[in-house]
């Protein structure tokens, strides 16, 4: 990342994955879009085997956000839902996503198989069956990434194309073949 920052030609956006370890020592870092998929009990040895300490380290990503920024999170994660409720009002835009129909969610799944994004008084719908990557976890990834894309002004047409054409890294749930009606996935 340090090398990227020093490049003469700067990209418009950086997408950065940060660990709790990195966030522990960040005080002035400001993200415009924070995205947390879930909080699970990883790396507890570094946090005295205390889940709350670990989770609070992850939440440091929000510490310098303002009303112009967004927090995208899985609304079904118990810790995240409780955190947001306990810290109301939060300054940044809250964009929770759910894998079932949910009133008030920024993204959810309709009963008729659509991924729905409710963003800036518009609804964007996309058939889940047409997502390039299938599976419940990939639906969550698509919802979160789509909310981030809309947050930075990506057009709906570009988003539709990306959701349909996205290619995963090799050997990561890679479609191999369909033989006698059986789908083979590496």
Regions of interest found by a model, annotated:
Residues 4, 26-27, 174:
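Short, well-ordered secondary-structure micro-motifs
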Residues 1, 20-22, 168:
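Short acidic loop-to-helix transition motifs that present clustered carboxylates
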Residues 1-9:
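Conserved substrate/cofactor phosphate-moiety recognition/catalytic segment
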Residues 8-96, 107-108, 126-132:
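Flexible active-site lid/hinge loop adjacent to a nucleotide/diphosphate
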Residues 3, 63, 161-164:
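Generic alpha-helical structural context detector
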Residues 1, 57-61, 79-80, 138-144:
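Internal, well-ordered alpha-helical segments in soluble enzyme and binding-protein domains
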